[in-house]
Structure formats: structure tokens, C-alpha cells
């Protein structure tokens, strides 16, 4: 059971582990202090995601569901590290109760997909989640990378961009099974 859990964690964070290794390799090679600082910030942001995502998996397997509070802790820690990285970031999560492992990890995976896509250019990110009969996730992003491609891995996602270049990503996840 323990091996299965570790295999699941490794499989679900393999891309981020590879990103982390790439940045560590680049960090060892760079002589530019500004680039080194930027890489260290990215390493912290990606490392936080790996730690928190694995924690969601562990808690979910142990308890059969994940509390909204646990998801809140994940997003708050990631937001704090994005602020340290230099991007304005805030996460507001309203509601409580339980979510299925799939619901919680889908929300956190979308958050990470946005962060990864915008990592070099992210200026600000506002995350708003409301948990009721369904889970509604809204993100407002100021960055240079277009995010419309996120509809591929997240088919239920809605994406808009306003005249000022702000991007809005919305996702509704039914709250079945984890109530």
C-alpha cells in the first residue's frame, strides 16, 4: 500500500519534479545573481506545489476525502510563496465541508497549470473559490502567456481575456461524492 501511494505521488507530480530538476541544473550553471534569484523563487514555488499536492494525495487516501480547509492551506501556502517570488497573489476560499480527492486535486492542478504557464511573466493572480452545492473556482491573472490552451486538460474550463489583457479562468466542479 505504501509503495502504491508513493508511486501515485510520483506519477502525479512527475512533470513538476522534472521542472524542478531543470531549474536546479540551470541554477548550478548560472553566474547571473538576478537569474539565480529568479530560479530560486521558481524552485520554491514548484517545490511547494509538489509538497502540497503529495499531501493532498496522502490525506485523501488516508481519509477518503479532503477537507476544504486542507485545500485552503495548500492554496494559501502557494500564494504566499508566489508573493515572495514577486507576484501579487491572493487566495480566498469560502465554504467548508469535504471534497473528493479528484475535486481537490483538480482545483489545485488548475491553479498550478496557470502558475506554470505564467511563471516567467506572472504579475498578479487572484484565486476565488466558493464551495456550496458545487465548487466554483475563479482566477484573475495578469501575465503575458495566453491561457486558452488550458481548455485541453480542463475541458469544463471557461476562459476570457479583457481589453486590458487580464485573463479570467473559471471552473465549476460538481461536489458529488465528497459531501
PLM region descriptions:
Residues 32, 38, 151-179:
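Flexible, glycine-/charge-rich segments associated with ATP-binding catalytic modules
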Residues 137-145, 173:
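Conserved DxG motif in ATP/Mg2+-binding regions
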Residues 13, 146-155:
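Glycine-rich phosphate-binding loop
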Residues 2-13:
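Short alpha-helical H-box segment flanking the phosphoacceptor histidine in two-component systems
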Residues 11-93:
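Conserved DHp (HisKA) dimerization/phosphotransfer helix of two-component histidine kinases, i.e.
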Residues 16, 23, 27, 100-128:
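Conserved ATP-binding N-box helix of the HATPase_c
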Residues 2-4, 86-115, 133-136:
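Conserved short strand/loop->alpha-helix "switch" segment adjacent to the catalytic nucleotide/phosphoryl-transfer site
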Residues 126-136, 140:
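Short beta-strand/loop element within the Bergerat-fold HATPase_c
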Amino acid at each position: 500500500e505504501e509503495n502504491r501511494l508513493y508511486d501515485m505521488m510520483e506519477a502525479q507530480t512527475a512533470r513538476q519534479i522534472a521542472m524542478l530538476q531543470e531549474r536546479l541544473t540551470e541554477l548550478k550553471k548560472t553566474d547571473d545573481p538576478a537569474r539565480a534569484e529568479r530560479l530560486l523563487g521558481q524552485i520554491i514555488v514548484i517545490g511547494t506545489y509538489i509538497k502540497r499536492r503529495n499531501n493532498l494525495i496522502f490525506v485523501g487516501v488516508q481519509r477518503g476525502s479532503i477537507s476544504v480547509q486542507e485545500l485552503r492551506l495548500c492554496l494559501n501556502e502557494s500564494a504566499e510563496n508566489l508573493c515572495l517570488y514577486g507576484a501579487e497573489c491572493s487566495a480566498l476560499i469560502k465554504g467548508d465541508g469535504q471534497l473528493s480527492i479528484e475535486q481537490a486535486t483538480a482545483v489545485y492542478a488548475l491553479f498550478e497549470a496557470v502558475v506554470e504557464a505564467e511563471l516567467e511573466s506572472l504579475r498578479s493572480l487572484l484565486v476565488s473559490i466558493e464551495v456550496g452545492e458545487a465548487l466554483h473556482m475563479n482566477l484573475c491573472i495578469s501575465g503575458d502567456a495566453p491561457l486558452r490552451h488550458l481548455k485541453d486538460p480542463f475541458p469544463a474550463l471557461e476562459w476570457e481575456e479583457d481589453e486590458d489583457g487580464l485573463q479570467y479562468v473559471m471552473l465549476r466542479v460538481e461536489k458529488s461524492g465528497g459531501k
